[in-house]
Structures are given as structure tokens and as C-alpha cells.
């Protein structure tokens, strides 16, 4: 699993440059009184000799562990590279599992907020988990920065209206799926010249939100959405749903879902009357080796974040994608299996910079102002990360928002990740 390393090393830079800032390790005996915050959300006091507490909340077991494990490892690498904050070490404790579900997100968030020493969270992996975790984290005065949540409902409609699941203190380095939906719609309508398409979701906030974003954008371009329906994540027989879709005679089907359901859709669609030759399209949930190497995935188009990071450098640590991937493989024996590893690394350094800006040493202890942590992130502009330049809007969208579409060759996973056939940037 070395494809992501090839992408980072071989592809061109977007010409983002590092501002050269780095994390110094000030002595714990120094006094710092120019930190951000007004105390309105409380202050965390870290006693001398103790660690600053943050948490990783990601899907680290089950079918979506391929997404959460690289996220957690990205956080761990960022902590190691960043170093101490004002002489205090930072720890994630034991990684928590969001189970890629609302129940999992809620249970883990309850554990987090019960510990008043926790300052912030990197997670969740899945948008569905965030819908339940975010309100609890917000109410506790903490922050949560997600590397891979993409549902528009968690932030905004990009036109000034908060999403139904937006809560203050929530941020993300991942893109907003309104951009990904627009990218795939533009690709299908303008590049493939297909004017009739259908979409399938599984009811999850991520899959349904992205399918809807695609459908809306496709219709705005002049296309016709011939079908919009859902499957259950546990379904293995997709023929009834595909037969329903076939009735509309679409030229393409976009199914931004996960494995194993995505495996069955790709496998069974060509055998359904009326769908022979239909173009199959997926998204970042299927942009993984275990799916892309399946015979039924051959020739498919898959959208996701633009991984062509080139020489982009994280301004806090000086780390590039090439360096990150070399360290990741050395530490773990394999390359990341999912495309949000750099988003996780950048999310972690943002949190660490926010804590640094909102804290000072007093009588040998570190005082961290919770409101100051949010203040730093709310005003973030022009931060240079591995993924590019990050700036946070009023609803927590901080990511680079660049999307690519790749065409899959099931016999060449590494080459497929690099096989960009369409690029989109707002």
C-alpha cells in the first residue's frame, strides 16, 4: 500500500509555501500572559509535570477502520513532530472509537467530556458519528477538528446558513461535500457528456448528503436525476434497488457509500436489465485498495480530496507529505489506506497551535483558556499545511476544498490513485 507516497512525491505542487513558523518548547518556568481567551468557557489547569490532554476519536474497528486508523496515526505523528507546548508534553491518552455511527460517537463523546482536563478532540472519522458527538463536545466548551467529516450539515450550506448539525467549537480540515458533489456533477455532465444520472446512498449523513449535493448540482447544470434512493448498509442483494434505478434509464449511477455495500452495487449493476454499460461512480469512501482492486470496480470513477501535495509543508513542523509518508511507513509497516492522512496531521497541528496561543505558564502550571482555543481557530487564515492553505470560515470549514476524480484500473491500485482525469477547485 504505497500509492499515497507515490502521489505525494511524484505529483506537482500547488505552489503553497510554508510561512516558516515552528513550535518552540518554552520552559515551563517562564510566565506568558499574552495568551488568547477571556475565560468565558473555563480554564484548564495542567499542573507541573502533567501532560496536556487531547483525544483522538476515530473509527478504529469495523468496516471503516481503514479510515480511522490512519487518522489516529496522523495525530500521533503530529504530536511527535510538534513537540512540547510551553514545556508541557501533549498526549491523546488511549484512542477512542467512533464506530462510524451516531451511537459510537455519542458514547465516546460522553467519555471525553467527563474528563475536564481534555482540551480538544481530533475526530470523528465519520459524519454520522459527529452528529452525536459534536453537541456534547460543544456544550463542554471543547473543540473538535475532524480530518474526514464532509457532510454539509455539520458546517453550512456555504451561503451563510448553518447546517442542521452545526455546533460552535466544531471545525474540519476535510472538504465540504457541497464541493465534492459539484465536482462529480460537473465531471459527469460536462466531461462524460451524460445528461441523465441516478444516485444511491445508505441513509448515513455522509452518503445521503453527498448524493444530494451531486443531485442538486447535476440538475443545476441542466441534467436530469432519474432516481435517488437508499440501500441499507447490511444489504447484500442490491438487485431490487438497482431495478428501481434502471427504470429511469440513467447513463451514470453515483453511489458514494462504503464497503461492503459498495462492493455489491458495483458487482450486481451490470447484470440488471437496463444498466448494461451504465457508468459507475463512487467517492472517497470507496477510494481504498480493498475496493479498487475488485474486478467489478475496474473502470469506475472515484472522487475525493486532491492528494497532489507536492512540496507543501506544514508550517508548524516543517513536514512535507513525502516526509510524513516515509515516517508513517517506518512506524507502521505500510502506507495509509485512506486519503485523509494529511488532513489528520494538519488538524492536529492546528489544535496544538490553538492550545499554544491560548495558554500561559503561571506559578509553574499551564493555564489553557478554552475560549482562546476557539478564538484561534475562528480567526485562522492562511495557515500552511500539507494539504495546502487553511482558513476557517464562520462555520468551521477550514479545508483546502480541492477535489479530483480518478479512473480506476483494478490491476493497478497505485497507478489508479495517480490517474486523475478531472480536477475541481471552487
Regions found by a protein language model. Name each.
Residues 7-10:
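C-terminal motif of bacterial Sec signal peptides marking the signal peptidase cleavage site
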Residues 12-426:
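Extracytosolic ligand-binding ectodomains
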Residues 1-3:
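Sec-dependent N-terminal signal peptides
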